Regions:
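Extracellular ligand-binding/catalytic regions of CAZymes and related secreted enzymes
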Residues: 65, 74-80, 84-112
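An acidic, glycine-rich "communication" segment
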Residues: 1-62
Length: 112
């Protein structure tokens, strides 16, 4: 397995043309605190999630289906989080996405 795929616990497979994508944080998950579902135009990434131990904390849905949109995992003594939305600035400016990103960074830094 390629090194980056092994590190991330999965790999990008494809995306359709940009469309309305709903980001669905898993309520009650610590990395989803302060976020709520929202829908914006984005690239809907389809992923092959290889790691059965990966902790999915957000899914994405569109007319093309549902996918794991964010997960976290431990690799050795390190932590990493993968978030697939964010190909348009409107996603980055959305308060719920900012909460997901900040929580992920805090968890990776062992502050959460």
């Amino acid at each position: 397995m390629p090194v980056l795929r092994s590190l991330l616990g999965g790999v990008f497979t494809h995306h359709p043309e940009q469309c309305l994508v709903t980001v669905n944080p898993h309520l009650g998950h610590p990395l989803s605190a302060g976020s709520a579902p929202f829908t914006l135009k984005d690239e809907h990434y389809f992923m092959a999630l290889d790691d059965p131990q990966a902790d999915v904390f957000m899914t994405t849905t569109s007319e093309h289906g549902e996918q794991p949109g964010a997960w976290r995992r431990v690799e050795g003594s390190g932590r990493l989080a993968v978030l697939t939305p964010g190909h348009n600035v409107e996603v980055w400016l959305h308060p719920s996405f900012q909460a997901l990103l900040l929580n992920s960074l805090r968890w990776c830094g062992k502050l959460l």
